Amino acid sequence: MKRIGITALLILALAGVTIPSVQPATASGTHSITLMPNGTSGTSKIVRTTSHSYKLPKVTFTRAGYTFLGWAKSARGAKAYSDRATIRFTSSVKLYALWKEIMPAKPAVAGRTVGNLLWRDEFYGATGSSINADYWTGRYCDQADENGGGTCHNNEPQWYLPSAVALDGSKAGNAVITTKRVYAAPAEGRCLAWSGCQFTSARFDTQGKVAFKYGYIETRIKMPAGGRNWPAFWMLGENITSVGWPQTGEIDIAEQGGNTPNRNSGALHYSTNGVANDCCGNHTYDYGSYNGANYSADFHTYAMAWTPNRIDLIVDGIVFKTFTSTSIRSQYWSFNNPFFLIINNATGDFGGAWTYWTESQMTIDYVRVWKLDNQGEVFIR
């Protein structure tokens, strides 16, 4: 650059000409662009540049159950820039990833109207983390009604441990019950089987936290493989602590035995005399079953369409059993009240003989509850 003499500068100044200042690029002229993950795991990314324009890099942040929309100028701001947009700035900036929750598609139920999504758990979370304690309680063996309706009946040879269920950290989001063949008692838990216990497993439920009355209730599960496994997705009446079983009612939406992996069954259990706390000679049940795929080889959907005085049990979109208040073997229909959800893998005779496996897994993708035929309520306790 040519030097301008002092005399020339003085002449220009006297003539009223503004003289621009010229500053060299120094550290003070370096700006930073900070990219924030905003609501998901990940480390913020900082880019330093002396330029006043910059092309944003392809987003590397991910958030399970959400799709990336672009970048905002504040954590709750509107979209300001698209992915890989070129931005212009005169000072350091901080941009926040903008996310939109991915909503599941409504299931198709023949002859029925599925309404709004009322509640769901997609089981998103870091690998090995616990299930959502706002919704679920992991149980130990304890036959008190306050303990998830009572656990480890039927001479089931397992210790239930809350630690035996955890999230797998996958993009899809799963809760996994790991059942193990063991040869020594674990440090925690109780065995209530009179013949002794040989397995550890898990059971968790929404008792005292979330209850449901009517609607379309659906889960997607890959069932455990091997004899002795006894997985189930089911419900008990919320009033079990006051009226007991079977008067409270039991809905087995999906129940399987590991020795018959192609058979899925479901049932209603109820009272024959309508008397509270009168177990167990007054108990009866109705059930249905469906033989289909190997349910332990892949994921399948299990659902219940529940409206006043009617329950349809469904596997992979196929209604395999319908119960009504006039079709069951008792006048005491207990299924027009709030119920809570239970997911477990028991072990026992229903699953057949042990087939020498050392570990099995029941993988639960989601649980979703929709309104059905304008019926459906969720109660957050």
Where do the protein language model's features map onto the residues?
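Generic alpha-helix initiation/capping and coil-helix boundary signal
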Residues: 1, 6-8, 90, 156-157, ...
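Secretory targeting and sorting signals
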Residues: 1-24
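Short linear motifs in intrinsically disordered
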Residues: 22-27, 299-303
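Secondary-structure capping and domain/repeat boundary segments
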Residues: 25-102
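GH16 jelly-roll
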Residues: 101-381
